[in-house]
Design a protein with these regions (language model features):
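Bacterial N-terminal signal peptides that target proteins for export
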Residues: 1-8
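Bacterial signal peptide processing site
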Residues: 22-25
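Acidic/His-rich structured neighborhood in mature extracellular/periplasmic domains
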Residues: 154, 165-236
Length: 366
């Protein structure tokens, strides 16, 4: 299967074999967030569009990397399970190619990791990366190490840095795409009820309105994607505790997201993960977990982002949830997640459209 995917990637790239513009950065292993106020780079005029699908990574290796276990260590990191899903799915779909076969055509893959293990060249482990060198959008990361054992230790230690770096880049790529192809109906209804702006998935075609609540859905039997937005008064910092979130979410969903029979409604399962983050330079509570329908065999993953609308002293919650029992859910929920970060609160409506929506992981330059 991976050979087929690689062959498709090569065919797609061959039609776009042009030389891109460089945007080089040196890096060490310490991560930091790039400010949301900085403008996102636009596609250079003569740079081709990158090939490959979202969350696909091409790893370029030397033959010895297979023998020492260095490649396997990196592969295991990249394919670690996505958090918050109802079934095991890899963080990334990994293809591999030896350096001898890393042709110009393959230079246009959207995410590339090059393994550089050589004691004659490197004295310590380090990340290096470049953006949009051969195509757009694209990240080419070099992982340097003096030997295989140091490489393996470095990659394991920086597991979260690697995953978050590429994941956030993909989320921002999707957010940029949504700003060009968004759902005008959702945007209008959200503005009318909440005074907020958002770029949501074009496929959302069904709507339900409640009190301080909107629900948009693709209304599919499978691969069903849903977006909800609701608000409630902001009290104090205790508003962002786990217990408060679950109680508030369950009360809102009970009133607005029913099951097929009376007495059935959406609930939050105990499997919930909380993360404090920043969106547009302000605090955001990001929650991932699973939902189900009370007394009914139906459920799936959700992700929500809660932010404080200081102008109106309320909490605005945007959430995406998926129902797709017969298929993988990673790309579905991540498309929805990307749309959540495009939310503009009333005091943010003058933000430029080309700013970062979710702070990227940026590895410190030397």
């Amino acid at each position: 299967m991976k050979k087929i995917l690689l062959a498709v990637c090569i065919i797609m790239i061959a039609a776009m074999n042009m030389v891109g513009c460089r945007d080089n950065k040196g890096a060490d292993k310490k991560p930091k967030a790039r400010s949301a106020a900085k403008a996102k780079a636009k596609k250079p005029l003569f740079t081709p569009t990158s090939a490959g699908g979202p969350y696909e990574v091409l790893v370029v290796y030397e033959p010895n990397d297979l023998l020492t276990g260095a490649f396997d260590t990196l592969y295991n990191v990249l394919t670690d399970d996505v958090l918050g899903l109802s079934q095991a799915e890899p963080s990334f779909d990994v293809m591999k190619i030896s350096s001898n076969n890393f042709s110009k055509n393959l230079h246009l893959c959207r995410n590339i990791i090059i393994m550089n293990i050589d004691s004659r060249v490197y004295t310590q482990c380090k990340f290096k990366y470049t953006k949009n060198v051969y195509a757009y959008p694209q990240i080419v990361m070099n992982i340097q190490a003096p030997n295989a054992e140091e490489f393996k230790r470095f990659v394991k230690t920086n597991h979260d840095v690697i995953i978050n770096f590429f994941t956030r880049a993909e989320l921002n790529h999707e957010a940029e795409h949504l700003k060009e192809q968004y759902n005008p109906m959702v945007r209008e209804k959200v503005m009318n009820m909440f005074g907020c702006d958002i770029f949501s998935l074009p496929e959302l075609n069904k709507t339900k309105t409640g009190r301080n609540f909107l629900w948009f859905s693709t209304d599919r039997v499978n691969k069903d994607m849903n977006f909800v937005i609701y608000s409630y008064p902001y009290r104090d910092k205790r508003t962002f505790t786990k217990d408060y979130f679950i109680r508030k979410r369950d009360s809102v969903m009970k009133a607005n997201v029913p099951g097929p029979r009376e007495g059935q409604y959406m609930m939050t399962t105990p499997f919930v993960m909380f993360n404090d983050d920043e969106v547009h330079g302000a605090y955001a509570q990001v929650v991932r977990g699973l939902w189900n329908i009370r007394n009914y065999d139906m459920g799936g993953p959700f992700v929500s982002v809660a932010r404080v609308d200081e102008k109106n002293q309320r909490v605005i919650v945007v959430e995406g949830f998926v129902y797709s029992p017969a298929t993988d859910k990673r790309n579905l929920i991540r498309r929805l997640e990307a749309s959540l970060y495009t939310l503009r609160l009333p005091e943010e409506l003058d933000l430029a459209r080309n700013t970062f929506d979710l702070d990227e992981i940026e590895i410190n330059p030397e």
